[in-house]
Amino acid sequence: MNYLQLAQRLRREMNDTGEGPHNVTNQTGRNLEYVDAIREAWLDIQSLRPWNKRFCGNGFDGDNLQELEASSDTPFIPKQFHVAIVYYAMQSKALSQNAQELVMRGQNEWDKYLHLLCERFLPTPSLGK
């Protein structure tokens, strides 16, 4: 999913009526909140752990994070993990709306994806030498 699709998916997961966003620039109101939540969630996820080189896309690392700016920007992680960004964003968005059932759902889904991300992209610990 690209940046725009992630923001649209977040809106659906939040059970928000209406349409949009239709792009990620020049947004106001709720659409701006969804766009911002996705951008911030992706930056947070990149900074959560000391991910290994397989996690990072070309030219990106813990010191040079990928910022989503254009509608077509796509997070560098494999496609099957893109929805993790939505669930991470959903937690804070649901908190701001005092929607406890959505907070719980966001946390449960994010926990599943965090486990998968850690299993696949954290350096393997070693003992001794």
Located regions from the model:
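Generic hydrophobic/packing signal
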Residues: 10, 34, 90-93, 103
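Conserved short "hinge" loops at termini or chain/domain junctions
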Residues: 1-74, 108, 112-129
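Short, hydrophobic/amphipathic alpha-helical patches that form generic packing surfaces
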Residues: 83-95
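Short conserved catalytic/interaction loops centered on acidic-Pro-aromatic/His motifs
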Residues: 97-108
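Exposed beta-sheet edge/beta-hairpin loop segments within beta-rich domains
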Residues: 75-80
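Extended aliphatic helical segments
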Residues: 24, 35, 83-86, 103
